[in-house]
């Protein structure tokens, strides 16, 4: 499994800047995108993948896979995982703070369809997590990057990775743990 986000983090670390600082640079500096996209295409082509199946995770590898498929690469399956805003927030808590914060959110954040991130902000703050306000600000900043990324890729390559027609399989992961999602994907692939 290869994570495109790790490439992004590695490049930021080499430059001595934070991921957030690098994300802002992407608005004006296209070289970072081109470097990451080139490395993504190398991964899709099989470079440094020693198994029969390679998984490349990220916001846009499916479209890079389409480019590679047009160049003759075979057996590419493009999968899009989507989930509710609530689940995005809970998973962010798990990843950035830890399991206890995730469990607290799971128990206390109502399972309703939130319209946007702002409508969820108070729910996260009300969890009274250590640095809860900073956490939600980071979450909102991270999610707002998505709009910038989509506009950038549209400008660079002419695609919107949020357009689900570019995927072979779309899986809703809301209210599901990883093992359940894995089983669903395997069933779809069979």
Regions of interest found by a model, annotated:
Residues 4-74, 85-90, 94-136, 140, ...:
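ATP-dependent small-molecule kinase phosphotransfer cores
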Residues 81-83:
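Conserved AAA+ ATPase "SRH/arginine-finger" region at the nucleotide-binding site
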Residues 129-131, 136, 140-190:
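NTP-dependent small-molecule kinase module
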Residues 54, 78, 170-171:
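Short, well-ordered beta-strand core segments
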Residues 72-77, 165-167:
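Short glycine-/polar-rich loops that comprise or flank the Walker A/P-loop
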């Amino acid at each position: 499994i290869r994570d495109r986000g790790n490439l992004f983090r590695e490049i930021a670390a080499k430059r001595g800047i934070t991921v957030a600082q690098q994300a802002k640079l992407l608005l004006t500096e296209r070289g970072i995108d081109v470097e990451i996209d080139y490395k993504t295409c190398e991964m899709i082509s099989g470079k440094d993948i020693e198994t029969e199946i390679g998984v490349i995770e990220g916001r846009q590898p499916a479209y890079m896979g389409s480019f590679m498929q047009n160049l003759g690469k075979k057996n590419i399956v493009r999968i899009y995982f989507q989930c509710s805003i609530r689940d995005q927030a809970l998973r962010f808590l798990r990843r950035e703070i830890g399991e206890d914060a995730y469990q607290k959110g799971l128990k206390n954040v109502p399972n309703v369809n939130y319209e946007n991130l702002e409508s969820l902000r108070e729910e996260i703050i009300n969890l009274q997590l250590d640095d809860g306000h900073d956490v939600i600000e980071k979450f909102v900043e991270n999610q707002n990057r998505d709009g910038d990324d989509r506009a950038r890729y549209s400008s660079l390559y002419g695609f919107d990775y949020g357009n689900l027609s570019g995927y072979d399989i779309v899986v809703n992961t809301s209210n599901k743990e990883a093992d359940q999602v894995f089983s669903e994907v395997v069933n779809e692939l069979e």
